[in-house]
Amino acid sequence: MTEATAGRVQRYILDGSDEELRRLLSVSEVTAGAARRAFGRAGVSPGWAAIDCGCGPIGALAVLAELVGPAGRVVGVDVSELAVTRARSVANALQLGNTEVVAGDIHRLDPAALGGPFDLAFTRLFLMHQADPVQSLRAIARLVRPGGWIIVHEPLRDPPPRSHPHLDALDAYWGMLHDVLEQAGVPRGTVESLPAAARAAGLDVASADGFFILGEPESVFEIHASTLAAFKPTAVQCGIAAQTVDDVLTSLRAGQAGGYEWVSTPFFLDLALRKPRS
């Protein structure tokens, strides 16, 4: 994030009255740098219109809002009304006047109704949940102008997140998440096959890279624990014992108390896709 946005984030983390929002902003800082670098490579600049697909409660809204500036605009979309409510709280707290957050399904959105087409679309932790990523990428491409960009940050199943010292709960949680996704109809290897899916969707793969992030245990363990807590109901519906989920969750939260040098995110596939000009 630039100094202006980062400063507002830090002030809210230190002094904000909404504990949950403070937590979300702390978590967002872990991935802000990777998003900023990807947007920079795509040439995001003042005046651009950008959309964060599946933005959740914060996504990359703050980074995009800063990059496109007052002359640009950012739209965040999520299917969850609760996530949209939280994202609006983030935008208000950070005074992101160029940002709008709406509830909707990416597959059914009308670009014109959102003020599109957009110069750039972004997904993180979104395509990993899609049973038909080709269809999802086509839907996202409809939101983008010819020649526009789609930046994709999606985590691979292997390797799982790591820590030092090693924590078995990280392996258990990451494997559990992917077992649930497969039972929900997401094909194994969905993220690994995204470059092929992009080409099948009619997109050009401008670059394919990858990254993981090492962070402070308190923040990164919180990312993993909150992810597990969010999918616990679905895991239980898929036949995983609630106590099994709770045991892993307890281990992840205990890691926040100390004893670890570092914790990593999963390894993210970093794709820069481009919609053909004709």
Predicted feature residues:
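A short glycine-rich, Lys/Arg-flanked "PGG" loop and its adjoining helix->strand segment in the class I
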Residues: 134-149
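Class I SAM-dependent methyltransferase Rossmann-like catalytic core
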Residues: 10-31
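A short acidic, Gly/Pro-enriched loop at the edge of an enzyme's catalytic core
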Residues: 111-120
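Conserved catalytic/acceptor-binding region of the Class I
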Residues: 151-219, 234
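Conserved alpha-helix/loop element of class I SAM-dependent methyltransferases that forms part
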Residues: 29-49, 63
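Conserved Class I S-adenosyl-L-methionine
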Residues: 189, 204-278
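Class I SAM-dependent methyltransferase SAM/SAH-binding core
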Residues: 51-111
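A short SAM/SAH-binding and catalytic strip from SAM-dependent methyltransferases
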Residues: 119-133
